[in-house]
């Protein structure tokens, strides 16, 4: 009887270990979960915090919400996973709207309008720029921007994989359709 009980307990312990090992998500599936969450996450219209200007909330809340919904409308394909102990990388191809080109168009238009005299001393420049920027960003129709990025994963002490999606500038730039790259390019041209 003792042998039978010991055997049953041993089998249960083995099954628990086997299920725990199988239940652990791979880096690839954790990245997929993170991407799905980003695409469906509810966003608050907090433009004033983003741009550090409370008046923007009232003026541009709708346009900002529309833009954020477009940002969340990216497509992705998980390409490759490489695991090395407690570290892993997952390659993801992002396809989205070319917000970088829209940003550059906005910048070029503002510069041209300033040179031509369309922007005068009486022009509310901030209002003009934000209206033009949101108009250009929200009018992008095709998902023509494509970039493959590497998401870094780390296994924590609980054996769970975590990602650097929230701090990965390359990923964020891809999700934003190259907008960070466009901003850097414009800033470099001013130097």
Locate each region found by the language model.
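Positively charged n-region of N-terminal signal peptides that target proteins for export
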Residues: 1-8, 12-13
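Core segments of small alpha/beta cavity-forming domains
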Residues: 23-77, 101
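C-terminal motif of bacterial Sec signal peptides marking the signal peptidase cleavage site
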Residues: 18-21
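Short beta-strand edge/turn micro-motifs at domain boundaries
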Residues: 112-127, 139-188
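Extracellular/periplasm-exposed beta-strand and loop segments of Gram-negative cell-envelope proteins
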Residues: 65, 103-105, 136-141
């Amino acid at each position: 009887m003792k042998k039978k009980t010991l055997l049953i307990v041993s089998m249960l312990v083995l099954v628990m270990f086997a299920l725990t090992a199988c239940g652990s998500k791979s880096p690839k599936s954790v990245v997929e979960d993170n991407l799905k969450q980003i695409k469906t996450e509810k966003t608050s219209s907090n433009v004033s915090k983003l741009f550090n200007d409370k008046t923007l909330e009232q003026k541009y809340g709708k346009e900002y919400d529309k833009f954020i919904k477009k940002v969340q409308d990216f497509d992705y394909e998980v390409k490759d996973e490489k695991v090395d102990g407690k570290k892993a990388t997952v390659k993801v191809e992002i396809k989205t709207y070319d917000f970088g080109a829209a940003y550059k168009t906005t910048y070029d238009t503002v510069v041209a309008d300033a040179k031509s005299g369309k922007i005068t001393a009486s022009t509310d420049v901030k209002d003009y720029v934000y209206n033009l920027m949101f108009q250009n960003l929200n009018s992008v129709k095709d998902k023509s921007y494509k970039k493959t990025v590497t998401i870094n994963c780390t296994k924590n002490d609980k054996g769970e994989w975590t990602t650097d999606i929230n701090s990965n500038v390359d990923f964020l730039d891809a999700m934003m359709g190259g907008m960070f790259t466009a901003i850097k390019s414009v800033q470099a041209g001013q130097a």
